[in-house]
Each structure stands twice: as structure tokens, then as C-alpha cells.
Amino acid sequence: MFLLHEYDIFWTFLIIASLIPILAFWISGILAPVSEGPEKLSSYESGIEPMGGAWLQFRIRYYMFALVFVVFDVETVFLYPWAMSFDVLGVSVFIEAFIFVLILVVGLVYAWRKGALEWS
């Protein structure tokens, strides 16, 4: 009726893929020596003791640039498969992709006008 047996390999893969990290953490928790002390709790970077606090504040501009980059990176991920199969999909999918790009361009213009892309 529903041919659920065709998904057996998927469920097997999913179970094995879930068990491997669980077993890895479990085995390392059992076999790893437990040593707590001040050296274990101190900050460490490249073999050198840090000079000063470990917490730094970053300007919000870095986050805005990263956010705009991620949006257009995801756009590329969505548009590449569409471009590779454009001849099969037809005109309706072209219109949908055009609307998708138009929405992203509107967002880019909004970010530009708000000054999110200004570095100084």
C-alpha cells in the first residue's frame, strides 16, 4: 500500500548516524581521565596565558555585514539548482525565482538606505 519497506535503508542510516556521536561522547566520558584544577579552568590560547579579559565587545556593523552575507549566500544556494534545471522547470518557476530575487533586492535596498552597508 504505502511501500514503507523502501525507507528501511533511510531509517537504518538515521539510527546509525545518531548512535555514532552518542557512543563517541559516551566512550570518551568513560575513558577520559577526570582532572579538575585551576589550570583546567583557566583560559588558554595557542599555549600563551591571556593578558586581560576574555570578553570583548564587537561593533554591530560586523553582525550586519555577516547577516547580509548569509542572506545572499543562501540566495545563491537556492538559485544555483534552479539555474541548472531551468529548461526543465518552465516559465512559472522563472516567475517564482524572479519574485524571490526581487524580495531580496528590496531587502538589500532597505539595508543600504538604513546604512547597514556603511563601514565607517
Curated annotation (Swiss-Prot):
It is a multi-pass membrane protein. Its EC number is 7.1.1.-. Keywords: Chloroplast, Membrane, NAD, NADP, Plastid, Plastoquinone, Quinone, Thylakoid, Translocase, Transmembrane, Transmembrane helix, Transport. The chain crosses the membrane at residues 9-29, 64-84, 88-108. It comes from Agrostis stolonifera. This is NAD(P)H-quinone oxidoreductase subunit 3, chloroplastic. NDH is composed of at least 16 different subunits, 5 of which are encoded in the nucleus. It is found in: Plastid, Chloroplast thylakoid membrane. GO terms for molecular function: NADH dehydrogenase (ubiquinone) activity; quinone binding. NDH shuttles electrons from NAD(P)H:plastoquinone, via FMN and iron-sulfur (Fe-S) centers, to quinones in the photosynthetic chain and possibly in a chloroplast respiratory chain. The immediate electron acceptor for the enzyme in this species is believed to be plastoquinone. Couples the redox reaction to proton translocation, and thus conserves the redox energy in a proton gradient.
